[in-house]
């Protein structure tokens, strides 16, 4: 019973959590995370946000296997956005419900912005 309550609270935290740069519903949030991870991998060679996300997703699968389909759907949009970010260098804009038109490069200015996005999203997973 206690594990079920903890799992439910964890799932709510993951799905409902809305960091500063994460906009909209859970699908929007996962799309944004996928895009940010794609860009951090391109510019920094790291995937810290992905590791943190997958640890929490793994806990949800373990604690609440009945949430498997929901998590699968969220991970699908995450990976879709990750691939778009790596190939087109854009991220999802939840407000506009579309990928942004401005592309990111790995200039210092863009790296600072990408790092800021990553930090905000990581804070939302804590």
Where are these regions (language model features)?
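Secretory pathway export signals and precursors
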Residues: 8, 39, 101-102
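Compact alpha-helical subdomains of small soluble proteins
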Residues: 53-126
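Positively charged n-region of N-terminal signal peptides that target proteins for export
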Residues: 1-4
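N-terminal signal peptide c-region/cleavage motif recognized by signal peptidases
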Residues: 12, 17-19
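Immediate post-signal-peptide N-terminus of mature secreted/exported proteins
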Residues: 22-54
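Extracellular/secretory pathway and lumenal proteins
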Residues: 16, 47, 110-111
């Amino acid at each position: 019973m206690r594990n079920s309550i903890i799992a439910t609270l964890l799932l709510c935290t993951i799905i409902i959590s809305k960091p500063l740069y994460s906009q909209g519903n859970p699908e929007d949030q996962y799309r944004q995370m996928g895009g940010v991870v794609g860009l951090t991998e391109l510019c920094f060679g790291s995937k810290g946000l992905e590791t943190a996300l997958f640890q929490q997703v793994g806990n949800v699968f373990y604690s609440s296997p009945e949430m498997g389909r929901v998590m699968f759907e969220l991970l699908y949009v995450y990976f879709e956005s990750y691939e778009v970010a790596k190939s087109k260098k854009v991220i999802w804009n939840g407000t506009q419900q579309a990928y942004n038109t401005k592309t990111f490069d790995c200039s210092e200015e863009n790296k600072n912005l990408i790092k800021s996005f990553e930090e905000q999203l990581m804070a939302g997973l804590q």
